[in-house]
Amino acid sequence: MPPAILKGWVDRVIQPGLAYEFLEGDSGEGVPRGLLQARRAVVFNTSNTLPEREQSAFGDPLQTIWKSCIFGLFGDADFYRKTYCVVVTSTPEQRAAWLDDVRAIVNEKFPR
């Protein structure tokens, strides 16, 4: 589950009539049609759980939430997600390198 402040943002932005709509005659049981023009989504997560453990123990629920439940409403959006871990044992140098990596990925995915 994302932090509460992020969950609040998602609830405000990803809502019927703004981000998606149900087709006429569909009261919400069908597949919504995306309204947003975004065709690319990038998510960065931090974690104290190694990816291997996340996958084996939990099946990577954050991937499912972000890719399928949230950005899946955009249709065929190019989705990219990267997790940086383990935060609790990381060094300042390692965290600085993560930020450099984030900058490089953003520049690659959203060229100016």
Task: Place the predicted regions along the sequence by residue.
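Helix-loop-strand module that forms the ligand-binding subsite of alpha/beta enzymes
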Residues: 1-66
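Glycine-rich phosphate/pyrophosphate-binding loop and the adjoining helix
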Residues: 53-112
